[in-house]
Amino acid sequence: WKITNCVNTGDIKNGVSAIGGILGYMGNLDGPGTVIISDCINKGNIAVSGNDVGGIVGNLNSHGSSSQHHKYINCYNYGNISSNSGSTDGVFVGGIVGKEYGFAEFNGCRNYGTVNASSTSANSISGGICGWIEDDTSSFADCINYGKVTAKNNIGGILGEVSKAYN
């Protein structure tokens, strides 16, 4: 799969799960393969009540397949990204990606907008580039966050939380 040179300029104001400026959700990715999302730009503001929200991608899910490789190359977000959710599953918000399952590489990504995750009933996690990532072998190179990042729980200028960070 490849998604390249896409631009969103429209605001997104509704949505309850997996909301992204370019891609909301891609899942059921079993077996070997690579997903490349490159040179994509979001200029729209996203203000929703969803639980996986990102300026470029809401949720990319390979269901724990170690043979899945996800690449985010030179993706830029200029919009303000926020979710105010009552979801019991948690709220994950990122300038580029809200929630990422699998081995991911982030290269040359930038976030310029504010990123905010708030929840009344569960964890809220925010990252300037990625809110939550499962795989501890993922990498970030030449990524910069210029925006304010806020959340109730885990907050990171680049990454809010790594789920499986152990040896």
Question: Predicted segment positions?
Answer:
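Predominantly extracellular beta-rich ligand-binding scaffolds that present long acidic/polar faces
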Residues: 1-167
